[in-house]
Amino acid sequence: MILKNIFKKSLWGMMLLPLITGCDDEFLVEKKDFSGFNEEIYNDVQTAQAKVDYIYYLSLPGGTTGGSDDFSKSTEEFVGSSKFTQLSEVTKSNVNDYFFSKSTSGPYAFIRECNMFLDNIDNGTLTEDEKTPLKAQVYFWRAWHYSKLVNTYGGVPIVLTAQNAILGEGDITQSDLAVPRSSTAKCIEQIIKDLDLAIAGLPGSWNDANWGRITSGAAAALKGRVLLTYASPLFNRNDDGARWQAAYDANLAAKQLLEANGFGLADGTGNRAEKWEKIFVTPKTSEAVITVLHNTVTTDSYKKNNGWEQSARPKEAQGNGGYGATAEMVDLFPMKDGKRPGESTDFTYDPLKFYKDRDPRFYRTFAFNGVVWPYKQDAAYTVWSYQWFKDDASFISGKEGQGFAEYAGRVNTGVYVRKRTNPAAEFSATDKFSRSATPYIEMRFAEVVLNLAEAAVGIGNLNEGYEGLKAIRNRVGIPAGADGNYGIPAGLDRDGLFREILYERQIEFAYEGRRFEDMRRWMLWNDDATINNNTCARLGVEPFNGKRHHGIILGVKPEIYTASKSGLSYDVFNPLSPIYNETLVTRAGIAVNPNAADADFEAQIALLDNFYGTNLARIENDQLDPLSPRFEVTYLSKYYFLGLKENVMKQSPYLLQTIGWDDYYGNPGTFDPLAE
């Protein structure tokens, strides 16, 4: 009893650090390392729960997932070269270590925490009813970590008990610690076994105090994601129908289980998908299958803030500077009728006035010149990011201008990523936007719908694939059209529907950290006969290799105004500027609000059209990816499965290197991630 009280009062006075919301301080937990406590914690449900919560804390993804990192810069979403797309080859010496990382903070360290719990929980005095949901949550997180490893490497060592760190007699290759890489198939089998145990032991939903914990539906949805990945071309080069069937069965079961417990597609309608935008900032929504909650607390021991808001906001609004959207992403989004730009007969795409007549989600994904991007202290904050140039030659150079309408600092392209920011975000003079409690949704119900649609197409149920796509588009207000297809081409074959589903995922999940994994599992950087990869040709898409990222500069036409200095004092269009020229078509009175009623919105767009058409030209900024030497995306075939870093092989010489990579001694790797 004394030990129990010490744990309760000194270490875990309040439960659920990883799961708290921003509006309820009652559930704050002090972050403590819970890795070293003995088996007595398993005699009390609260201390055992605290151990589980510590595993959540170690395992939950960060709120800035989907930002500008090596993964997203390898896709169309962000500019710049990444480690995986630059001209120099990644080798065993400089490849990132996603395998062991650090002994205390890598995936196997987290798996060890799960194993320690599962090894010891049955030795305590808890009842079966108390133990079952605790064990089920830990089974989920063990499967989670193994699924990440398998996605990256293929087969990895399967360790299901907490190993003793003492080697004993002999060298490491003869130790019980020397666990070799299992086949990918064996790893998938173990992941599914853990997830089935999680599904069986978890409730379908939790009460408000425990909102954010893993449910049976979440475990089923992860199972569906894992099996869909295993059925995809990365792992399934011969297009084995049995794998698609397993993925279909798992995703159908996940969808049905989630729906039976109150989950589903949240309402995404409203003016230009206003309610869809709210999905990303609402702590409790039917869309959130796997979610990470945050708080607004500033005390280090209790703080769990989401850094996305601060990172995404422009410097003009006191943010860190924002995420710049590429021209490739801006031009990609469908038109208002759901058809691709250039394919719609009702809406003509104008690259200068790229904001006109777009998919409703466009206005919730991007922020551009003249659009209102509110926060709590300034509901009328309007983005202005045009540039001006000192002469004609500078204007046509494809480089940034010499003057900028963003006086506090600019983003690297004239369009911002707005998605996942909170229109009611609170700004403070001391913390700016850093105390954000906006949740991060790791898996939305929309993904379950599209996972099921893709698996349905995989087994030949094309109509079911169409229905999944239609459901996603219908819920954001895209019109069905005369053919009832919501802009989706009719009569597509299997590969054509795969292409449309991947396109829809690119729109629906933009800047959520999904695109890189979709490109990997469909091998969209190249076609390579040496590894039996022809998916780009099959789908009718251009490989991403050989491409460059571009920014959009909205430049003031030289015949209207040229200057060589930046700032308010040199901006002729800003009514607050000392050289404001009211005889020009200026920005006065322009504030395009996506929340406005349709008639008001169209009137606002007309004013913006006049400003753009009179004053601005679109310049493709080709300077954002490296030029010397000239960078073009170069994702090598061997990167589809990463190799082990040399320090891993030095410490664990029994681990075979992946095919395509050199082992520690410089010999070709022999481990085949595709071997059964």
Give the location of each predicted region.
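Conserved, well-structured interaction surfaces
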Residues: 44-53, 57-58, 84-154, 176-189, ...
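Bacterial Sec-dependent N-terminal signal peptides
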Residues: 17-43, 191, 224, 453, ...
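Short coil/turn linking the two alpha-helices of tandem helical-hairpin repeats
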Residues: 150-151, 157, 229-238, 460
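Glycine-rich, aromatic-lined ligand/substrate-binding cores of catalytic
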Residues: 286, 290-398
